[in-house]
Structures are given as structure tokens and as C-alpha cells.
Design a protein with these regions (language model features):
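Charged, alpha-helical scaffolding/interaction elements associated with membrane systems
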Residues: 78-79, 209, 418
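Small/polar-residue-enriched beta-strand and adjacent coil segments characteristic
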Residues: 22, 57-58, 66-67, 71-74, ...
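Residues within alpha-helical transmembrane segments of multi-pass membrane proteins, especially transporters
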Residues: 12-16, 103, 343, 371, ...
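Periplasmic alpha-helical coiled-coil/stalk elements that build and connect Gram-negative outer-membrane
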Residues: 3, 21, 143, 159-276, ...
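Amphipathic alpha-helical coiled-coil segments
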Residues: 84-99, 164, 170-191, 195-198, ...
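Terminal intrinsically disordered/low-complexity segments used for targeting and assembly
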Residues: 2-77, 148-151, 235-282, 288, ...
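Phosphate-coordinating loops and pocket residues in cytosolic domains that bind phosphorylated ligands
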Residues: 219, 282-283, 428
């Protein structure tokens, strides 16, 4: 009885000793070369609204149009790229569970019957055992570091999924806005074409009566064909926009959810800079993913270092053995075994050192990628913040330009009808008003798209309210 008890105690002690040490290097301190404040051009005149709050704003709270919300919901359910990201998370979770299982003994039951014979009579032996097979004592943290690396890789994939979701939300919003803007451009072109065609008919009638020159007729036809070309171009663009939205949504989008000829104000929140860049950028899911990849690579160095040291694995079992199946569990049939095994690497042909070098290189690569992610994030955020104020000013000026151009067109038409202005002056006024209306739509789209970009680059929340 005492020997099996000693074997059990030895196994318990091994569990305590397992993982007592680790050779993982200390986490590398990262100080990316980014300014401690946003550029002065970005912060000038901005209200004190913290950008750090953007990460906590769910997309349903940011994009308030119910049609756009419905399309985003459809895309999150059906988009194939996001589905791949979700499956990568599941795969990483399973890999972590596999690696974590190596930190505890694998206990199994084994039953066996042996028949042997020769010149002597046939003999039979029956046995049933409960035991542990090849459990490694993690004295130098190899198993623990491998488990930690798998855990950090799982966290990285989870952050990648959030990044993919945020990117998808932004792409759907931009595609939806672009469809609305191009539909508005098509409507403007169609209305302008109808007006020009009316003018052409009047000019042709006046030409027959001798009241219009051949030059006026040709110039009017030029306007008509220009507008007709724009109608065809924007009609094709609208069709392409719908196809892009269908691809992002993962299937057909109900016509009632599509924007009509409009540029919708989708953003109810106008996040502006006040927080520190580091506070903002570290909440971006792509930066978080890069950080977890760095931590995973760091843990792999610990596992590679531990491979240089001896490893001890234990195999033990306790059970019964008998020559009669009916007496397998009778008294006096108990058996046990305890088999420690030592593995001491002596010569591996440079394999262990190469593995360590590869793990170190992977860590250095991950560090560079982490720093690059932060620097890229700072530039993207600074660019979007700088454009925010500029586009507001452009939109205000463009709206004033449209009002002035339309007023000039009305006055020019009246003066032409009264015989005070030339037909060329009227044509210039019409072209100016048409171009101004088109530019206004483009500026509105640019402003809204920048709001979407700002939400994305500041790590906008991926949660939705219930």
C-alpha cells in the first residue's frame, strides 16, 4: 500500500513543481515615435470632446439612419470576409485549448487481455489500469510559454475580428453614402438634360424663324450632349455602387433600404480631438492585435530557450492484473507502475539555436509591426481630423457658391429674354450653376465619408446597443 501511495505523492509533487519557472524575456517596452499631442492644425478651434470616447460609441449610435443600420446589420450577418475572421477566432480558441491541455496530466483507463503460448500451455493475462502517460514537468516554463503564446494569438485573432468588423461597418457606410451621392448626381444630370432639351427645342424653333444663329443652335446642342453623357456616366456608376453594396452586404439589399437621390447626414456625433494620441490609438483593434502578436512572439522565445534544458516526463498507472477475468478485481491483484523519463539535449545539429534565433526574429518582426501600426494609426487619425475642419469650410463655401450661381443663372436668363445679354453669357451661367451643384454633392459626400473615416481610425466602437 505504501508504494502506490508514494507514487501518487510523487505525481502530486510533480504538478506543484510544474511551471515553477519561465525563461520568457521581459516584455519589450515600446515607445513609438509619435507626438504626444495632435498637430496644432488639427486641434485649432476644436471643442473639448475627448477622442477616447469614440471607442465606446456603438455603430448604431453613430449611424442614425435606420436604412443604413439595416444594411450594416445584414452585412455583419452575411459578409464572407467577416465570416472568415470569426472562424479564425474559433480556430485560435481551439488551438489555445489544445496547448493549455498539455499543462495538466492526461488521465486514461486501459484494459488489456494477453494470450500467449508455445510448447507450454496457453496462458492468459487480464489487466485494467488508470494512469497518466508522458506528463511533462514544466520546470523551465516551456509548456506554459507555449500555452501563453497560443492565448495571445487567440486574443490577436479576436482583435482582428473586431478590426474586420469595424472596417466592414465603415465600408458599408461609405458604399451606401456613395450610392446616395451618385444617385443625386444622376438626378441633377437628368433634370439638367431635360432643361437643356427644352432650350434646344426653343432654339430650333427660333432658328427656323430667323431669331437664332447657327452658333447658338450648335452651342445648345453641345450642352444637351454634355448632359446626356453625364446621365449615362452616372447611371453606370449607380449600377456599380449597387453591386458593391450587394457584395459587402453578402446578398441582395431590399430596395427600400437603398438611399435615393440624396446625401444623408448619417453621423450624429462629431468626435473632435482633445485626448492624448496614445490613449486613442491603443484602443484601435488593429493596434491591440499587433500588441498581442508581439506578446505571443515573446512567449515563444521562452519556449525556445526552455528547449535547451533537460525535460522530465512522468508515466504512472495503478490497477489490477489477473490470469482470470473473473478475478481481475479480487484482493491481491493490484499492480502499479511509476516511470520517470529524463530527456537531456546534447547534440541537435544546431536545431535548438536556430529555433531560438527564429523565435527572436519573429519577436523583432512583431515589434516593428506593432510600432508601424501605432505610427500608421496616428497618421490616419491626424489626416482625418485635419480634413474634418477643412471639409466643413469647403461645404459652407460650396453651398454659398451654388446659391450665387443659381441666382446668376436666373438673372442671366431674364436679361437674355429681355435682349440685354448674349446667348454666350447665358450658356456660361448655366454651365457654372450645373458644375456648382455637382461639386456640392461631391463635397457633401467627402465630408460624410471623412466622418466615417474618423470614426474608424479613432477606433470607433464595434458594439451595438440592444
Amino acid at each position: 500500500m505504501r508504494k502506490p501511495m508514494m507514487a501518487s505523492v510523487a505525481l502530486a509533487v510533480s504538478l506543484v513543481l510544474s511551471g515553477c519557472s519561465t525563461l520568457e524575456p521581459r516584455s519589450t517596452e515600446v515607445a513609438p515615435a509619435i507626438p504626444s499631442q495632435w498637430p496644432a492644425a488639427v486641434t485649432a478651434g476644436a471643442p473639448a470632446t475627448s477622442t477616447a470616447e469614440v471607442a465606446d460609441i456603438g455603430w448604431r449610435d453613430f449611424f442614425v439612419d435606420p436604412r443604413l443600420q439595416a444594411v450594416i446589420t445584414q452585412s455583419l450577418e452575411n459578409n464572407r470576409d467577416l465570416r472568415v475572421a470569426v472562424l479564425n477566432v474559433e480556430r485560435a480558441r481551439a488551438q489555445y485549448r489544445i496547448q493549455r491541455a498539455d499543462r495538466v496530466p492526461a488521465v486514461g483507463v486501459q484494459g488489456q487481455m494477453t494470450r500467449s503460448g508455445g510448447d507450454a500451455p496457453v496462458t492468459e493475462q487480464f489487466s485494467a489500469n488508470l494512469g497518466v502517460v508522458e506528463f511533462e514537468l514544466d520546470l523551465f516554463g516551456r509548456v506554459r510559454n507555449l500555452s501563453q503564446a497560443a492565448l495571445q494569438q487567440y486574443f490577436a485573432e479576436a482583435a482582428n475580428r473586431r478590426s474586420a468588423q469595424l472596417s466592414l461597418v465603415a465600408e458599408v457606410a461609405n458604399a451606401w453614402l456613395t450610392l446616395g451621392a451618385d444617385s443625386e448626381q444622376l438626378r441633377i444630370a437628368q433634370a439638367t438634360l431635360a432643361t437643356y432639351e427644352d432650350s434646344l427645342r426653343l432654339t430650333e424653333a427660333r432658328r427656323e424663324l430667323g431669331g437664332a444663329s447657327a452658333l447658338e443652335l450648335s452651342q445648345t446642342r453641345t450642352l444637351v450632349e454634355t448632359a446626356r453623357t453625364d446621365v449615362a456616366r452616372f447611371a453606370g456608376q449607380v449600377a456599380q455602387d449597387r453591386n458593391a453594396l450587394v457584395l459587402l452586404a453578402g446578398g441582395p439589399v431590399d430596395a427600400t433600404l437603398l438611399p435615393q437621390a440624396e446625401v444623408t447626414e448619417v453621423a450624429s456625433v462629431r468626435p473632435l480631438p482633445a485626448g492624448m494620441p496614445g490613449d486613442v490609438l491603443l484602443r484601435r483593434p488593429d493596434v491591440m492585435a499587433a500588441e498581442h502578436v508581439l506578446l505571443s512572439a515573446n512567449a515563444n522565445i521562452g519556449a525556445a530557450r526552455a528547449a535547451f534544458f533537460p525535460s522530465i516526463s512522468l508515466t504512472g498507472s495503478i490497477g489490477s492484473a489477473s490470469s482470470e477475468l473473473s478475478g481481475l478485481f479480487d484482493s491481491g491483484t493490484r499492480v502499479w507502475s511509476f516511470i520517470p523519463k529524463l530527456n537531456l539535449p546534447i547534440f541537435q545539429g544546431g536545431k535548438l539555436r536556430a529555433n531560438l534565433g527564429m523565435a527572436t526574429a519573429d519577436r523583432d518582426i512583431a515589434l516593428a509591426q506593432y510600432e508601424r501600426a501605432i505610427q500608421s494609426g496616428f497618421r490616419e487619425a491626424a489626416d482625418a481630423l485635419a480634413l474634418n475642419e477643412s471639409l466643413d469650410a469647403q461645404l459652407s463655401s460650396q453651398q454659398a457658391l451654388v446659391a450665387a450661381a443659381e441666382q446668376a443663372q436666373r438673372l442671366s436668363q431674364a436679361r437674355y429674354d429681355a435682349g440685354l445679354d448674349s446667348f454666350l453669357t447665358l450658356l456660361d451661367a448655366r454651365r457654372t450653376a450645373y458644375t456648382a451643384r455637382q461639386s456640392l454633392v461631391s463635397t457633401q459626400l467627402a465630408q460624410q465619408s471623412n466622418q466615417v473615416a474618423l470614426y474608424k481610425v479613432l477606433g470607433g466602437g464595434w458594439h451595438e446597443r440592444g
